[in-house]
């Protein structure tokens, strides 16, 4: 049985997302989109008994106020947004039965930055290029291509769901209220355009997340980069500035160096361009980016490709039924 959720207040930027997002269209310029903190999102779907690909809501910084038309089971994971159900505290990381007519109200994120709401049965919006994920900049996917707006109605595929299920404490991402984050990076693909002392400076320095950051890119503020000789002695086709290079594809998670400004290219980033990418943040570390806030400090730890793959397998191993009690 289908049900509707009425959007009383949309929140700061609440969007429909699904896992793993819109893959297979990178060469056409469509990024994967999908949940920024995939770990928290996947656990929310498991809690309510949804399929892994079921669509849910990503709530950024300040969550929405939603009224449910019918009985359902919901779960809220990720950032702590001090949510209430009809005025009573709503538990995080737990599946909860909601009765028709009840209202879920969220506040500002007090710990972390993004929370995820799963509803039994999953949110029903049209698939675009194989996914329901919202790609804001192109107006693709989600509910009418954009973040939720006050007064809209969200369709849900009604599902039974089981209330009273909790994610085990040691199976959740460790979202803290501190301002310091250790972020893993893989060196490359354009690390040879940076001098060795420049690479060491990057790894040994603190980098501040700027307020001008979103699901397209995370702008960082820190010391100046030191370029290798090849960055200055290159051919004219590569561009004038040492950070310029002949247009090429960008890996998701690459740290794109635009002049002296590093920008981490995340879920909704461009697929190609003419700037170098000396490091790449692996997907298994994206949950840390998703849960950090402007002015937080990053320190980067270099890992190998094999270590990054092992990190991803570790998260995959926690996004399973055995993580529920």
Model-derived segments and spans:
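Conserved "landmark" site that anchors the functional core of diverse proteins
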Residues: 1-325
């Amino acid at each position: 049985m289908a049900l509707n959720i009425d959007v009383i207040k949309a929140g700061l930027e609440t969007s429909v997302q699904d896992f793993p997002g819109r893959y297979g269209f990178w060469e056409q310029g469509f990024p994967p989109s999908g949940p920024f903190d995939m770990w928290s999102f996947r656990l929310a779907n498991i809690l309510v008994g949804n399929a892994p690909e079921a669509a849910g809501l990503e709530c950024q910084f300040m969550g929405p106020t939603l009224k449910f038309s019918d009985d359902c089971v919901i779960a809220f994971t990720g950032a702590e947004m001090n949510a209430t159900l009809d005025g009573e505290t709503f538990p995080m990381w737990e599946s909860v039965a909601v009765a028709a007519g009840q209202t879920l109200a969220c506040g500002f994120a007090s710990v972390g930055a993004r929370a995820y709401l799963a509803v039994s049965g999953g949110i029903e919006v049209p698939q675009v290029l194989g996914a329901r994920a919202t790609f804001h900049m192109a107006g693709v996917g989600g509910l009418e291509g954009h973040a939720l707006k006050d007064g809209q109605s969200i369709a849900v595929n009604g599902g039974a769901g089981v209330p009273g299920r909790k994610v085990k404490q040691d199976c959740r991402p460790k979202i803290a209220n501190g301002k310091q984050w250790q972020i893993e990076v893989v060196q490359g693909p354009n690390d040879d355009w940076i001098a060795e002392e420049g690479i060491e400076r990057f790894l040994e320095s603190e980098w501040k997340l700027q307020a001008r950051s979103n699901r397209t890119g995370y702008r960082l503020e820190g010391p100046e980069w030191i370029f290798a000789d090849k960055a200055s002695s290159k051919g004219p086709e590569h561009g004038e500035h040492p950070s310029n290079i002949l247009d090429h594809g960008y890996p998701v998670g690459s740290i794109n160096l635009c002049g002296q400004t590093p920008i981490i290219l995340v879920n909704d980033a461009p697929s190609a361009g003419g700037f170098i990418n000396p490091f790449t943040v692996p997907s298994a570390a994206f949950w840390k980016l998703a849960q950090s806030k402007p002015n937080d400090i990053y320190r980067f730890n270099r890992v190998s490709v094999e270590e990054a793959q092992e990190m991803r397998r570790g998260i995959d191993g926690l996004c399973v039924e055995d993580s529920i009690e």
